[in-house]
């Protein structure tokens, strides 16, 4: 799959609660299918909402960085290089491949009834929030798109 373009817009949302897993120091989804919030935590959550024809819609949630919980809905216009038999199998393939690629890149991830949930903890350094060395949270757009392109290049 080749992602030809993407755009984002914001909306206020409530997002799934995440909890630090003390055993391995990674972020763990404690309720991937429910919608709860935990005060004072900073994290990203991505959902693969749906795929319609050649449009892949991702929902990227950002909590704790801005005054309100903002969601950036990323509409990716996709060109699938190979035909997948039906819509359901295509979505399953995208979710499966993206899950593995995000895990390989060091993100926390889980697959639940609401699709793919991907997260990364944020830390504040010198007044800026950083994720894996990316100072501006909005720069994660290109990182996410690169990961998705890699994960779906055989689809």
Task: Put a short name on every predicted segment.
Residues 1-12, 132, 140-154:
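Acidic metal-coordinating catalytic centers involved in nucleic-acid phosphodiester chemistry
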Residues 1-59, 66:
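Charge-rich, low-complexity N-terminal segments
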Residues 19-37, 102-124, 146-155:
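Short glycine-rich, low-complexity/disordered patches
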Residues 47-132:
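Intrinsically disordered, low-complexity regulatory segments enriched in Ser/Thr/Pro
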């Amino acid at each position: 799959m080749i992602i030809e373009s993407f755009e984002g817009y914001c909306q206020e949302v409530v997002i799934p609660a995440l909890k630090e897993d003390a055993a391995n120091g990674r972020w763990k989804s404690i309720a991937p299918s429910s919608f709860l919030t935990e005060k004072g935590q900073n994290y990203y959550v991505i959902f693969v909402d749906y795929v319609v024809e050649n449009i892949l819609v991702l929902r990227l949630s950002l909590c704790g960085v801005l005054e309100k919980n903002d969601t950036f809905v990323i509409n990716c216009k996709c060109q699938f290089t190979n035909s997948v038999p039906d819509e359901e199998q295509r979505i399953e393939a995208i979710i499966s491949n993206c899950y593995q690629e995000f895990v390989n890149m060091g993100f926390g991830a889980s697959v639940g009834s609401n699709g793919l949930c991907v997260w990364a903890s944020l830390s504040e350094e010198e007044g800026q929030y950083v994720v894996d060395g990316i100072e501006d949270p909005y720069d994660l757009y290109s990182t996410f798109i690169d990961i998705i392109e890699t994960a779906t290049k055989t689809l």
